[in-house]
Amino acid sequence: VSYLEDEIEEVRSYISEPFSQTIDCNQGWHQLIVDCHRELSAIDPDYKLYQVKEKFGGLRYYIDSSSKDYYALRDVINKFERLSLQTCEYTGEPGVLAKGKGGWMKTLSTEVMSEYGYEKA
């Protein structure tokens, strides 16, 4: 998935100060993030990105925009957040919600689940 590094750097460049330019999830979701960014920037090239992370097993993409198309932006984000719940965070392959020790949730492929100590939720 390293071929996405340039595109991920472009997404990072949209992260507003004082927020860290960290994308806090594994590379299996990088394609989702790049595609989400492309769709968002087509609607509002000046949108501000605050944070991209994994939370409760799904992708979270936090933005701000003064665009009159704010609801269209939210629809794009909602679409990619839903897609993340079907995509392994490590491999980008189809995945399902899995539960690990301590109740941590991740979306993982069945091949990766046991390797990381998770089981289907």
Language model segments and positions:
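Short cysteine-rich clusters marking metal-coordination/redox-active sites
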Residues: 88-91, 109
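Cysteine-rich micro-motifs
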Residues: 102-115
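Short metal-coordination and nucleic-acid-contact micro-motifs, chiefly zinc-binding Cys/His arrays
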Residues: 83-87, 95, 102-105
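Long, charged N-terminal interaction/targeting segments
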Residues: 1-76
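Catalytic-core loop-and-flanking beta/alpha module that positions acidic residues
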Residues: 39-40, 53, 60, 79-82, ...
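Short intrinsically disordered terminal tails
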Residues: 1, 115-121
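Short, mixed-charge amphipathic alpha-helical segments
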Residues: 71-87
